[in-house]
Every structure is written in structure tokens, then in C-alpha cells.
């Protein structure tokens, strides 16, 4: 049977009933837009309507992994009834089967022969293109304009970045994104827009677009992590200021032996590894160290000139700073001027920024703390 979508084009003339076929074709659109979980869900929906829908089983196989030790693609393919597949479905089945053994020769020959026999198949033309070539994506969009959301998605990247004969053009890239969104209802195109905006330093657009992607699955979404990253990039100065304050507050908590305050800045799941300015061995700093009786009393202690550097994904911060002060030995009463340079590493966790490393060393003409 031939089932046309509302726009007169479909991915595959499948072996499912009329209602299931519409769902299956939407499912392939999700595959083409790298929305595998949604494609899998569409396939399950099709099977609820038509439990003999073999194309839905192929979609589930296409959405899952071919990895032998943990993937379930083989299991999904074993459930397919080959006798009920049409010619295009059989080509797709054989291609998926070849991925189980990384048999690229069989994969490519099956696709090539399948295209010769089915030159107007949208699915096979999609699988045959080089996704990283602008011209291949444009050719598919010209042939199948109503199924080209994935092609417009890839072209948006290629136009925004330029190269391979394509001039970079951000406005045109956003036009490609709009075309993709008009053709397909899914989150990945908004993730694409966010990534392109971020690459061009527009973190406000990146954040708003990423949140649109996240909104498709507000719990457990794969898009949330980047939304958090873009928020941090957009608010980089504020985050840096808060880290500077946290570094000072943490050190004050150590000097005052304030457990509750100190706990705010460390994680129960990560060690705080410290190298003191006495240049002794590195060690894990714990509450036992915090409460240890010291050989000295601090007369003054000030941290200054803090600089903050972030990892590219905004999950880690590196702080460099200097500390000046003075302390007095409890036993002898001797006073010593203290001058060090230091660095600290903080990581972003679900419970906020936490310190995991600090390294202190005396300045060239300075003195650190004594051996404890």
C-alpha cells in the first residue's frame, strides 16, 4: 500500500496498516533528526495499533545499539518477520544486520543495489548521502522537500561554520533552522540553534533555544546539561564573583574551624586534595584536619587578586590568587610574616560549586605555614 502524508511525501511505503504507517513515517523523521528515543516511542505506538507492523520493528532496531556486549539491535532484528517486508524494508533490514558485525562492504553494496532497484526511495536516498557534505544535504532537500528537516539541520551547521566551498552566513543558517522546525516537530533543531548561537558567542539565544529543546522532555532530558552550561556562560561574571567569595569564605571557615560553613564548599562525593605552603606531601583534607590543634595563631590573613578561569563546558573552575598575613607560634611567641601564591580547583555539582583541590606555595621571598 502507498500511504502519503499530508504533504504528499513519505519515507517508506511500508507493510503496516494505514494508521500505523503514518506513525512509522513520523518515527523515521525522528530518526533522521537524531531523536532516537522519540523514534523508539513512535515505533511502540505503531505496534499498539498494528502488532504486525514490521517497519516499526526496524525503527526500534535502528534506534538501538549494534554493540555486541550491551546493545539490543540484534534482538530487535531477530523479532522482524522477513517474509512480510517489502523491498525497501528488506534493504534496510540487511543494512542494519551488517552493522552488527561492522560489515561495511555488505552495508554499502546492499544500499547501492537497493537504490538501483528503488531510486525514488526517500529512506534509501537519506541513508546514502554524506551527512557532512552540504551538497548532499541540499540534493536530498531538493528531491524530498517535505522530508528535509534533517538535511536543513545539517546545512545550518555547515552554513554557520563555512568551509568546503560554503561561505559562513549566520543569518542563512538560522533560515535553515526555521525551515527544519516548520517541517518537523522535535527538539533537536533547537539544540542545533543553541549550539550555533553559542559558537557565535550569543549565549542568550543559546540558552532560550536549549530550553525549548529541553521542554520536550522536562524530566531526564538529554538537553538539560547544555542548558545549564549556557546559563553559566551567559552569567559568567556573576559565577566568577560567587566563586571568589566562596574561596574567601571557605578559607575563613578553615581559620575559624567552622564545620558548618566549611561543609558548604566541599562535596561528600569528592575528596579535597590539598598541598600546603609548607611544601609537604599532598593529602586529603577532612574535618579531622579542620579541627586539628594548630601550632600557630593567625594574626591576619587576606586573600587577594583572585582570577577565575573556566573549562569550556563550565563544569570546572580554576582559581589563582595570593594570600598575605602573619601568624604567631603558640609555644615561642615568634611572629612570622606570611606570603603565598595559590591555586584552587572547583567543580560544578548538582549541589552547587565544590572545592576539590588547593595548592599553596610561598612566594619567591615569602614564607608559608610551618610543618604541622
What residues fall within each predicted segment?
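Alpha-helical segment of the N-proximal tetratricopeptide repeat
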Residues: 16-45, 49, 90-102, 127
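Residue-level recognition of tetratricopeptide repeat
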Residues: 19, 28, 53-54, 62, 87, 96, 120-123, 130, ...
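Structural motif corresponding to the intra-repeat A-B loop/turn of tetratricopeptide repeats
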Residues: 33, 67, 101, 134-135, ...
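Alpha-helical repeat scaffolds
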Residues: 71-84, 105-115, 136-148, 168-181, ...
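Short, low-complexity N-terminal intrinsically disordered segments enriched in polar/charged residues
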Residues: 232-268, 369-372
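A solvent-exposed, acidic/Ser-Thr-rich amphipathic alpha-helical stretch
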Residues: 259-313, 322, 337
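Short beta-strand edge/turn micro-motifs at domain boundaries
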Residues: 339-369
Amino acid at each position: 500500500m502507498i500511504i502519503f502524508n499530508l504533504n504528499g511525501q513519505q519515507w517508506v511505503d511500508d507493510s503496516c496498516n494505514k494508521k500505523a504507517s503514518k506513525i512509522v513515517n513520523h518515527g523515521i523523521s525522528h530518526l533522521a533528526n537524531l531523536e532516537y528515543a522519540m523514534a523508539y516511542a513512535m515505533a511502540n505506538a505503531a505496534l499498539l495499533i498494528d502488532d504486525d507492523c514490521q517497519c516499526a520493528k526496524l525503527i526500534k532496531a535502528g534506534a538501538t545499539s549494534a554493540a555486541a556486549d550491551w546493545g539490543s539491535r540484534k534482538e530487535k532484528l531477530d523479532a522482524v518477520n522477513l517474509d512480510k517486508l517489502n523491498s525497501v524494508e528488506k534493504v534496510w533490514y540487511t543494512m542494519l544486520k551488517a552493522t552488527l558485525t561492522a560489515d561495511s562492504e555488505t552495508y554499502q553494496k546492499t544500499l547501492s543495489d537497493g537504490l538501483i532497484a528503488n531510486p525514488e526511495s526517500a529512506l534509501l536516498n537519506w541513508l546514502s548521502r554524506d551527512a557532512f557534505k552540504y551538497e548532499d544535504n541540499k540534493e536530498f532537500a531538493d528531491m524530498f522537500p517535505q522530508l528535509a528537516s534533517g538535511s536543513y539541520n545539517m546545512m545550518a551547521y555547515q552554513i554557520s561554520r563555512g568551509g568546503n566551498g560554503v561561505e559562513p552566513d549566520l543569518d542563512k543558517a538560522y533560515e535553515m533552522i526555521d525551515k527544519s522546525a516548520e517541517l518537523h516537530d522535535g527538539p533537536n533543531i533547537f539544540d542545533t540553534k543553541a549550539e550555533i548561537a553559542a559558537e557565535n558567542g550569543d549565549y542568550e539565544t543559546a540558552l532560550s533555544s536549549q530550553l525549548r529543546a529541553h521542554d520536550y522532555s522536562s524530566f531526564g532530558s538529554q538537553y538539560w546539561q547544555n542548558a545549564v552550561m549556557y546559563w553559566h556562560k551567559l552569567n559568567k561574571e556573576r559565577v566568577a564573583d560567587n566563586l571568589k567569595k566562596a574561596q574567601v569564605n571557605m578559607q575563613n571557615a578553615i581559620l575559624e574551624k567552622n564545620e558548618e560553613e566549611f561543609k558548604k564548599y566541599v562535596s561528600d562525593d569528592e575528596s579535597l586534595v590539598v598541598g600546603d605552603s609548607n611544601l609537604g606531601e599532598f593529602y586529603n583534607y577532612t574535618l579531622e584536619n579542620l579541627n586539628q590543634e594548630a601550632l600557630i595563631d593567625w594574626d591576619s590573613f587576606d586573600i587577594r587578586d583572585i582570577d577565575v578561569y573556566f573549562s569550556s563546558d563550565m563544569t570546572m573552575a580554576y582559581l589563582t590568587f595570593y594570600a598575605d598575613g602573619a601568624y604567631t607560634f603558640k609555644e615561642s611567641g615568634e611572629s612570622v610574616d606570611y606570603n603565598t601564591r595559590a591555586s584552587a580547583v572547583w567543580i560544578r555539582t548538582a549541589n552547587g560549586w565544590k572545592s576539590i583541590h588547593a595548592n599553596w606555595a610561598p612566594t619567591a621571598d615569602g614564607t608559608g605555614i610551618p610543618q604541622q
